Swiss-Prot record:
One of its GO terms (biological process) is alanyl-tRNA aminoacylation. It is found in: Cytoplasm. Belongs to the class-II aminoacyl-tRNA synthetase family. It comes from Thermotoga sp. (strain RQ2). Its cofactor is Zn(2+). It catalyses: tRNA(Ala) + L-alanine + ATP = L-alanyl-tRNA(Ala) + AMP + diphosphate. The gene is alaS. This is Alanine--tRNA ligase. Transmembrane segments: none annotated. Keywords: Aminoacyl-tRNA synthetase, ATP-binding, Cytoplasm, Ligase, Metal-binding, Nucleotide-binding, Protein biosynthesis, RNA-binding, tRNA-binding, Zinc.
Amino acid sequence: MRYMTSEEIREAFLKFFEKKGHKILPSASLIPDDPQLLFTVAGMVPFKPIFWGKVEPVYTRVATCQKCLRTVDIENVGKTPRHHTFFEMLGNFSFGDYFKEEAIEWAWEFLTQVLGVPEEKLWVSVYEEDEEAFRIWNEKIGLPEKKILRMGKEDNFWGPAGPTGPCGPDTEIFYDTGYSKGCPEGEECTPANSEGRFVEIWNLVFTEYYQDEEGKLHPLPRKNIDTGAGLERFCAMMQGVYSNFDTDLFQPIINRIEELTGVGYKTDEEKDVSIRVIADHIRAITFLISEGVFPSNEGRGYVLRRIIRRAMRHGILLGMSEPFLYRIVDAVVEKMGKVYPEIVRGEGMVKEVLSAEENRFLKTLEQGMKVFDEIVEKKGKIDSEDAFRLYDTYGLPLELTLEIAKEKGVEVDVQEFNKYMEEQQRKSRAAMGDVEFARRYEYLEKLPKDFRTEFTGYEKLEDEGEVVLIARDDETVEEASEGTVEVVFSRTPFYAEKGGQVSDTGMVEWRDGKALVEYVFEASEGVIVQRIKILDGTLRRGQKVVLRVDKKRRESTMRNHTATHLLHAALKKVLGDHVRQAGSLVAPDRLRFDFTHFKGLSSAEIEQVEDLVNEWIMEAIPVEVRYTSYEEAVKSGVVALFTEKYGDVVRVVEVPGVSKELCGGTHVKNTGQIGLFKIISEESVSSGVRRIEAVTGFSALELLRNQKKLIDQLKEILGAREDELTDRVLSLREKVKELEKKLSQGRISEKMIAMKQLEDGVKVFHGVFEGVEAKHLGGIADNVLKKEGEGIVILFSKFENKVFLVVKVSENLLDRYDASSIARNIAKELGGSGGGRKNFAQAGGRHPERIKDVLERLEEFLR
């Protein structure tokens, strides 16, 4: 076998299958268009709707190199030669086209003729009942029977993913590395009896059955092929190395880690594990952040945070005490950027998000580890409540807690941890409100097969349609004469909530009745459901109706949607290309846009963005809409949000010279129809994500009117011209502060301040106050000494769960008493620190509840 680089292998695979009539498609996003999955875990994920029979394929033969991410075995990453979080899966797929014979023959041809793998190095396994696959391998390929292993369902039968669904036998191809560890003495080594010698390099799944509720298998009318081969394993095979980490996919990254840490690879096994963990995790981190996933405490963001913090901890084991992961990103981009340009575009963003997260974790890790050690010292174990507190309060992922505990030989009880986690998630969901997509809409099964609602809302706001289905409380009904029901019409001009844009509202009318359309949504692909409230008459299945969209509401929404595209473009121009959409809301009264950026916008930047958007509005640029393939759209430079499916015809909305995005929403005909754009707020949403809210058109006009009314009221109240308002308000604020200070000091001075006389006759005046700022306590102490003439004054103030104190000693007592020493003594008792001069000192503490004890032992602290 000749040495082949990862680039050569990737290209050879795709070219081979292109010659076999396959459509070569780009990798889909790591973020799947599938609510059941957090990440794309296999090459077939983008094609699930096709495998499940929900969508007709555009191409019957497809080949891809798919980005994938799995964390199910994350604790093994770094400890084995082949476990990874991020990996690339090569795959060829057939949707009702070729089947077993071609799939097996082409896999063999690619391995032996294109890659040049010696036949004697290859073994296969088949499902024990799959005689057809056995025959193809034995008779067509000519593989000896002893090299075809018959395996059970656990090893060689795929699916279904749930209790029911598509499934089928598979055949696996193994490569013999020659590594002899684990082979039984006196027996020939095979993939079934050796440990580590044979590596599974390719899995060919023959999806030919459907499993029903009783577990019975039924032949599928259309049989499919789904194959997957790990690029990393192909590289190890073709580059003559045993470990994937020794391939050209990882070596440049490992070299960079060696430079940064000063630790050589393959010098110490424990350190090698840490280097491999970092090399693996930095790839996952780079790709996830570049696709808009940011560290958080739930969902994908939590997985990313786990990966970052695990990599950081292994960096600490290598002696790193400062952020370093962000400095490895360029090695990943240099190696993989040509194949995946999204990481080139997002490099700056990845580094900034990662650097911020590293700094945040380093601040909490020290505190978290201190608490960890305290718990272990006290209990000898970490129970579920402790583990959850370390996660929730100190940011230590459970997996990290488990890993550290294992290293320290400490028992961890995690049985109840998930209950704490589920309760937190339940509260989070409750706070978010009812989530529409959580429903199953089983009543849609009553629709005709392959039914799709005809959407006409791009061209018109009024249309005729027919009632296809009526549902109440998730059950279909033939008619409805009152209350709220969900209805599917044959066609509709009503836009369903999607892509951040809220749904249309309006009216439905028929011969003897009418209903209010309250909400519209797409319950499954292509099926639009309208939630309506019947106002008059009886609505029946088959009824002819007229559907009228609320024109003013739709037009306001259109203004805001096009303005959102302009805002996105303006932010990129003002802040940089790292800006990516991270969420949006397009409503009739306002727009909200979440985007990636790492600090708040200055007033000047906000003005720049506003000016740009309003310039484009005043130019009245025509808004163009066209349909094209996803590939062509991406080639033309369109902004994509990683949610489009393979093969789909996509809708491109373009403002020439300004913006070009994939979008299914409704838009104005030209930018001039937006009228006016005004930002009303800019704030942080989470680490690395900012949010802008803005208004357009009549909402912007209303905002300006209200601001004018407010200014007029202030002018009248303050008796000032508009250009004098700022100075007048600042002057009043200073006067109020001064009056509050005098009032506070005057009132407090009049309060009863306790006095205690020491054995030497010295009087100690003390008092405890609520909410008095530290800067005012000194003035109060001055007032007390002025009134009393001499003595020691010790004053406390409880303020926001903390305590402040001042100590003042009159001049005649300075030879015997030191205010600085007294303040330090008391502060130590209160869990804080302090100091100052001999005659005046200040201090603070974290335990205001200990003040009473201090006063009872006051003389101790004066020594």
